[in-house]
Amino acid sequence: MKVIFTQDVKGKGKKGEVKDVPVGYANNFLLKKNMAVEATPGNLRQLEQKNKAAEAERQQEIEDAKKLKEQLSEIEVEVSAKTGEGGKLFGSVSTKQITQALQQQHDIKIDKRKMDLPNGIHALGYTNVPVKLDKEVEGTIRVHTVEQ
């Protein structure tokens, strides 16, 4: 019997997958526990529509990420930090400080965990910080660290 899985079933199939399973297994387990539905032409059409909608949504997310990447490449974020002798920073500039400055100066909100800056910024001047905007789209933020 062909079924469409409505959720992941370990060892059998993933959500949205269409598979042939034994009739008894389908009737007594998968269908009873709402883990799958019978693969009728109507259900298959519905699954296809869901997949198309999900693909369109995914394309829109990628498009938005590309626009944000373009926007980020044109701007500069200024972060001020306390310094000691010789222009050395006390501590470092973290991704949290960069996201706050980006929000205040340019009204752009980015999650700090998407920035690839493991040790922070330890010097005055310009630094390019890589940002993972999407699985497929990566941009950079130009950060200018100035003396407070």
From Swiss-Prot:
Alphabetical list of InterPro entries matching this protein: Ribosomal_bL9, Ribosomal_bL9/RNase_H1_N, Ribosomal_bL9_bac/chp, Ribosomal_bL9_C, Ribosomal_bL9_C_sf, Ribosomal_bL9_N, Ribosomal_bL9_N_sf
GO molecular function, one term: structural constituent of ribosome
GO cellular component, one term: ribosome
GO biological process: translation
Keyword Ribonucleoprotein included in the entry's annotation: yes
Entries under Gene3D superfamilies matching the protein: Ribosomal protein L9, C-terminal domain (3.10.430.100), Ribosomal protein L9, N-terminal domain (3.40.5.10)
UniProtKB keywords: Ribonucleoprotein, Ribosomal protein, RNA-binding, rRNA-binding
Keyword RNA-binding: yes
Function: Binds to the 23S rRNA.
NCBIfam families xref list: L9
Family of this protein: Belongs to the bacterial ribosomal protein bL9 family.
Protein's name in the database: Large ribosomal subunit protein bL9
Organism lineage string: Bacteria, Bacillati, Bacillota, Bacilli, Bacillales
Gene name, Swiss-Prot/TrEMBL: rplI
